[in-house]
Amino acid sequence: MDSLHSTMNQHVKGKHLSFEERVIIQLRLKDGYSLRAIARELNCSPSTISYEVKRGTVKLYHGKVKKYKATQGHDAYKAHRKNCGRKSDFLRKAQFMRYVHKHFFKDGWSLDVCSNRATAVGEF
């Protein structure tokens, strides 16, 4: 297929692979294309294709046959995406919140005093 006459949207470098691109990888591997040829067609790095093939390869027939499945690769991608992104600071700051709660409600300190005292003492 000539990329000049393709009706499919071209892959933008730096973006994640779509499910349609994973299906193309599956079909091209079935047809015997090399990883570099697939990368050229999708306009992405050969290492991207290599990582995707490793991520989406399943073992069939008691591990004797390995085959790339687009659905398996996409499911692995979604599972990995759940772990990315900024982590919540709430768990790390729970101790400080207990400190403020104790001194604000029980000792009658203001929020400014709680914050400044904790900073001055270097507790947090």
Swiss-Prot record:
Entries under Pfam families matching the protein: HTH_38
Keywords per UniProt: Plasmid
GO BP terms: transposition
Segments traversing the membrane: none
Classification via InterPro entries: Homeodomain-like_sf, IS30-like_HTH, Transposase-Integrase
GO cellular component terms given for this protein: cytosol
The keyword Nucleus is annotated on this UniProt entry: no
Cysteine disulfide links: none
Record bears the keyword Chaperone: no
Any GO MF annotation of the entry: transposase activity
Name of the protein described by the UniProt record: Uncharacterized 14.4 kDa protein in laf 3'region
